[in-house]
A protein has these predicted regions:
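Non-catalytic, C-terminal membrane-associated alpha-helical segments of glycosyltransferases
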Residues: 194, 198-264
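Acidic donor-binding loop at a coil-to-helix junction in glycosyltransferase catalytic cores
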Residues: 160-168
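Glycine-rich, basic loop-to-helix element that forms the pyrophosphate-binding segment
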Residues: 57-73
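Short beta-strand/loop segment that forms part of the nucleotide-sugar
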Residues: 8, 30-38, 55-56
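Short aromatic/hydrophobic "clamp" motif used to bind/position activated sugar donors
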Residues: 78
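Short, acidic, metal-binding catalytic loop of nucleotide-sugar glycosyltransferases
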Residues: 22-30
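Conserved donor NDP-sugar-binding/catalytic core segment of glycosyltransferases
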Residues: 86-119
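A conserved acidic beta->alpha catalytic loop
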Residues: 23, 36-44, 85
Length: 264
């Protein structure tokens, strides 16, 4: 049995959660916690069927859900795993071993992103596989010492982007953060324009909130969506993948729309 508490935030995630939790259960962690965000589907039933301890964040969002799970966890190490992640056999144990051997403050698994059969799901996955963000530390499938998250916390006002704010805050405090190249997990994107648009708006809002907190230190974040879109467009043209141009145009527009919405 692995001495770790696995925390999975989930809201209306029943179709994804089944495979996610089955993989976690096979890894035999000491504790599995699912934090439900007032789901209207079978999320809670799926969690209980896999033996998870189920908590509710009362719909306060993913940052609040993660922190609630950390506070309730019994183990000294916690693994934050999103419902859209599937960990292969041995992946959790390997990530824990690398975390301990490398002296990390936080270590995220590498992500192999896949999307649904439609345009927007495939485009989201393509962006995350080819973009620089795949090497950025985040909270998608990540191991921490519980005490670190209790000390530094997560800003519960964030709907998205709290991982960027936490990463920058921990880095300023000398934390050792990393993304594993040895342990890679499956990261699944839902399909449809509505899902993609919601992601972009929430991400833009998260960047704006980080800017509000950091002031001049966060000024570089203003250029982040533009730089990512420009890189994606340039690569699409160079590789003759012109079908992705519409994706990057929408990514650019709705990220900045999310930033403006947050600041008005």
């Amino acid at each position: 049995m692995l001495d770790v508490s696995v925390i999975v935030p989930a809201r209306n995630a029943a179709p994804l959660l089944e495979e996610c939790l089955a993989a976690i259960v096979r890894a035999e962690p000491r504790e599995l916690i699912v934090v439900d965000g007032l789901s209207s589907d079978d999320t809670v039933a799926v969690a209980r069927r896999h033996g998870a301890r189920v908590l509710s964040d009362d719909g306060r969002g993913v940052a609040a859900a993660r922190l609630l799970g950390v506070r309730a966890a019994a183990c000294e190490r916690v693994a934050l795993v999103d419902a859209d992640v599937v960990m292969g056999d041995g992946a959790l144990a390997a990530l824990l071993d690398e975390f301990a051997a490398g002296g990390y403050t936080g270590l995220q698994a590498g992500l192999h992103s896949i999307g649904g059969p439609g345009y927007w799901g495939r485009a989201l996955a393509h962006h995350h596989r080819s973009g620089r963000s795949r090497r950025w530390f985040g909270l998608v499938a990540t191991v921490f010492e519980r005490s670190v998250l209790l000390e530094h916390g997560l800003d519960e006002r964030f709907l998205s982007g709290e991982d960027i704010e936490l990463r920058r805050r921990l880095a300023r405090n000398g934390a050792r953060l990393g993304v594993s190249e040895r342990t890679v997990v499956l990261h699944r994107f839902e399909d449809g324009f509505a899902f993609a648009r919601g992601q972009w708006l929430a991400d833009g809002g998260g960047l704006a909130r980080t800017l509000d907190k950091e002031g001049w230190r966060g000024a570089g974040l203003l250029a982040l969506p533009a730089l990512a879109a420009a890189r994606g467009i340039a690569l699409s043209v160079a590789r003759r993948e012109m079908r992705f141009l519409a994706y990057y145009a929408c990514y650019l527009v709705f990220n900045y729309a999310g930033m403006v919405r947050r600041r008005t």
